[in-house]
From Swiss-Prot:
The active site is at C339 (nucleophile), H446. Catalyzes amidations at positions B, D, E, and G on adenosylcobyrinic A,C-diamide. NH(2) groups are provided by glutamine, and one molecule of ATP is hydrogenolyzed for each amidation. The keyword Chloroplast does not apply. It comes from the Bacteria. The gene is cobQ. Pathway: Cofactor biosynthesis; adenosylcobalamin biosynthesis. GO terms for molecular function: ABC-type vitamin B12 transporter activity; catalytic activity. HAMAP family: CobQ (MF_00028). Keywords: Cobalamin biosynthesis, Glutamine amidotransferase. One of its GO terms (biological process) is cobalamin biosynthetic process. SUPFAM superfamilies: Class I glutamine amidotransferase-like (SSF52317), P-loop containing nucleoside triphosphate hydrolases (SSF52540). This is Cobyric acid synthase. InterPro entries: Class_I_gatase-like, CobQ/CobB/MinD/ParA_Nub-bd_dom, CobQ_GATase1, CobQ_synth, GATase_3, P-loop_NTPase. The keyword Heme does not apply.
């Protein structure tokens, strides 16, 4: 071990991507907090376009922000020192300690970024442990820890476990099938000094009577010499998954609800967690629309953020979905864009530094839908910050969120008297409300729908146009709901899993 620790770290490894590492690490954070400890969540390297911005304006994966809330801490970029944000075409933006440091193609990543990534990880650890001297690190691995072709350059699994001499938990997803092969195969591919770090096994997503798996537990423990810490059942209430595919496959929620929200499933969608507050609202049905599908007549259309706005807009143009959106607006449809979605609604998108285009020379893709009189220019420096601003529509109130974008948008002209600034700070968003009470607008403020009162008034605007009664503000706000779900998750974890032998 190369670093002084008062408490042995716990590390959650998985037999594969999607095994359940994120939620289990999240539950362990709350579990230890209940025991009077101070857990410190940490994921050395994460790949995700679902990001959060901390109070210092630095980017980190949303899953580590969730884990920090579970631990009772304020999110900080040191908890996720290396973040890779896929841009498509085997290319990712590289974020070190919250700041963008470059772009890398997958084939060159380890050669170009391994050493600096490892230094960022060690620096993040040092800063966290200096401020939380009595805390216990709760580490989350990434994917499988035994990808033999990549293992020598793996920043965030067994290299980190050995560096910290962590007690490791191996999570296997029984829902996928082949759970015995998952466990035995993963351990067999480890070196002797790596195997000895595995102190427990968790069987995740089990359906049915656990008594039916007792012989399986006995066999696993006999073959591996490692105790099975418990069997976690399939949980009905879950959080935003790390892999966007899991969420996007929820094509219809609350079928038959009074209001239908359609969401464009952009090929390079980012920050889909902006939409989470709607998924637990029983008055709303959510429907995903892929390029090439029919838009239909939803009550409102949301165009979410994109990691590559110009390419995603080009996809909408090629498949005819842009024309469908324009026709929907002409017929009185309600449209709202977030970040990249706002940019697409404008007249033009200029990329002089090729932040979005990546060697694209085409200019046709730079024409927006022209539903808002704004022009977007992508700058060399990304703007990231938390914000609290006064919103002016559909009513006046202070709301919170965060910015995370290269593009800057400005009004081309203000001759259209219908357009208004959403905020006192006009560069954060605009809206046009037409005589028939339909609207087209958008904002750069991620997390805007987390503001419960504003979200309800926004929905009531749509309900009013449809002739429905206004709904009251939810008694349970989004933050309280998240806390309740964290407690429910931890209750289920504590009922089924025993980690006491790992923390003594």
């Amino acid at each position: 071990m190369n670093i002084d620790l008062k408490r042995t770290p716990l590390m959650v490894l998985g037999t594969s991507s999607g095994a359940g590492k994120t939620l289990i690490a999240t539950a362990i954070c709350r579990c230890l907090k209940r025991k009077g400890e101070q857990p410190i969540p940490f994921k050395g390297q994460n790949m995700s376009n679902n990001a959060w911005v901390d109070t210092k304006g630095r980017e980190m994966a949303y899953s580590q922000a969730l884990q920090s809330w579970s631990a009772g801490l304020e999110p900080s970029a040191e908890m996720n020192p290396v973040l890779l944000k896929p841009k498509g075409d085997c290319t990712s933006e590289v974020i070190h300690l919250g700041k963008s440091v470059g772009t890398s193609r997958a084939i060159n990543y380890y050669e170009d970024w391994f050493d600096s990534g490892w230094e960022a990880i060690k620096k993040g650890l040092a800063i966290l442990l200096k401020s939380k001297t009595d805390g216990r690190l709760i580490l989350e691995g990434a994917g499988s820890p035994v990808e033999v072709n990549l293992q020598h350059k793996d920043l965030t699994n067994l290299k980190l476990a050995k560096y910290l001499n962590a007690n490791c938990i191996l999570v296997a997803d029984i829902e996928r099938g082949g759970v015995f092969a998952q466990i035995i195969g993963t351990i067999a591919l480890m070196k002797p000094d790596e195997k000895k770090l595995i102190k427990g096994i968790i069987i995740n997503r089990f359906r049915g009577d656990k008594a039916l798996f007792e012989t399986g537990v006995t066999w696993i423990e006999k073959e591996t010499g490692i105790p099975v810490l418990g069997i976690l059942p399939w949980l009905k209430e879950i959080f935003p998954p790390e892999d966007s595919l899991d969420l996007l496959e929820r094509k219809q929620i609350n079928q038959g609800a009074e209001i239908e929200i359609a969401i464009i499933k952009l090929p390079r969608i980012s920050n889909f967690s902006d939409l989470d507050p709607f998924f637990s609202d029983s008055s709303i049905q959510m429907r995903w629309i892929e390029p090439g599908q029919e838009l239909g007549e939803p009550d409102v259309l949301i165009i979410p953020g994109s990691k590559q706005t110009i390419k995603d807009l080009e996809s909408l143009n090629k498949t005819g979905l842009s024309n469908q959106i324009k026709n929907y607006a002409k017929k009185g449809g309600n449209i709202f864009g977030i970040c990249g979605g706002l940019q697409m609604l404008g007249k033009s998108l200029e990329d002089p530094h090729q932040q979005e285009s990546i060697n694209e020379t085409s200019t046709s893709s730079n024409m927006g839908m022209n539903l808002l009189p704004i022009k977007t220019t992508f700058r060399e420096i990304k703007h990231t910050s938390q914000r609290e601003e006064k919103v002016s529509w559909p009513f006046s109130q202070n709301i919170k969120g965060f910015e995370m974008h290269y593009g800057e948008s400005d009004l081309i002209n203000n001759k259209d008297s219908e357009i208004i600034s959403l905020f006192k700070n006009s560069s954060l968003g605009w809206v046009i409300e037409k005589k028939d009470k339909s609207f087209v607008g958008g904002t750069y403020l991620h997390g805007i729908f987390e503001n419960d009162e504003w979200r309800r008034q926004w929905i009531n605007k749509i309900r009013q146009k449809k002739g429905l009664n206004h709904l009251k503000i939810d008694e349970e706000n989004n933050s309280d709901k998240r806390e309740r779900l964290l407690d429910l998750l931890t209750d289920a974890f504590e009922k089924n899993i025993n980690i006491d032998i790992l923390i003594k």
